[in-house]
């Protein structure tokens, strides 16, 4: 499986299928035709252009209901549930964050924010979504044994580097990829310091990806 980072919390998982998570940047700049789209919560920086794709969208009940009204194909689920779509397993996990929709200037509840454990071609990736640190991340590691953990470190709206490092230790994935940082000034972080701390004090490896860069999970 290959992971391509597209900036903010948007990543592409490419294997037997193409999974786009939390589309954010303009469609013309993504240059990917996903088979499936996963949306962790309803904020505009994560739903983004999801509604413009014809691919099925995996998300929570509230967002799925909203997107169906826009003509989208959806696969609704909720925290703790697992579904298999086109041979790809999606488990929705807890995230500590808010979630709301806006339609024609009217705000609406967007259901619970979430993360995803996604398994494809014998490899497993945990995308934490936007979240604060919570101790049950240990259970995610124990239950699903992800090969890679995608962890937000921007601070202010999610965990910062200190909490992100503890999250990485809780999860225990051999590879950590930081996300959701440096998109704008309020979430600017020194990602090299985060990587150094993990690489020097744990057995895990931190992979820093600039937008457009890829990481391949070796078999």
Curated annotation (Swiss-Prot):
One Pfam family here: Lactamase_B_3
Domain of life assignment: Archaea
Membrane-spanning residues: none
InterPro entries: Metallo-B-lactamas, RibonucZ/Hydroxyglut_hydro, UPF0173, UPF0173_UPF0282_UlaG_hydrolase
Keywords for the protein's UniProt record, in alphabetical order: Hydrolase
SMART domains: Lactamase_B
Keyword presence, Hydrolase: yes
One GO MF term: hydrolase activity
NCBIfam families reported for this sequence: PRK00685.1 (NF001911)
Annotated family: Belongs to the UPF0173 family.
This protein's name: UPF0173 metal-dependent hydrolase Mhun_1705
Source organism of the structure: Methanospirillum hungatei JF-1 (strain ATCC 27890 / DSM 864 / NBRC 100397 / JF-1)
């Amino acid at each position: 499986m290959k992971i391509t980072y597209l900036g903010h919390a948007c990543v592409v998982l490419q294997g037997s299928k193409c999974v786009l998570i939390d589309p954010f940047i303009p469609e013309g700049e993504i240059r990917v035709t996903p088979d499936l789209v996963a949306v962790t919560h309803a904020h505009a920086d994560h739903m983004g252009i999801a509604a413009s794709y014809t691919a099925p969208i995996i998300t929570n009940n509230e967002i799925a209901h909203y997107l169906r009204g826009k003509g989208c194909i959806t696969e609704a689920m909720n925290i703790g549930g697992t579904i298999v779509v086109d041979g790809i397993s999606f488990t929705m996990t807890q995230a500590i964050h808010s979630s709301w929709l806006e339609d024609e200037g009217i705000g609406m509840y967007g259901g619970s924010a979430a993360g995803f454990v996604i398994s494809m071609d014998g490899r497993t990736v945990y995308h934490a979504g936007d979240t604060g640190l919570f101790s049950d991340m240990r259970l995610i590691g124990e239950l699903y044994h992800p090969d890679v953990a995608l962890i937000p470190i921007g601070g202010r709206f999610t965990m910062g580097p200190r909490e992100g490092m503890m999250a990485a230790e809780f999860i225990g994935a051999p590879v950590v990829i930081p996300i959701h940082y440096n998109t704008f000034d309020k979430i600017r972080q020194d990602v090299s310091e985060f990587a150094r701390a993990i690489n020097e004090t744990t057995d895990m490896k931190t992979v820093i990806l600039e937008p457009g860069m890829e990481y391949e999970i070796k078999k």
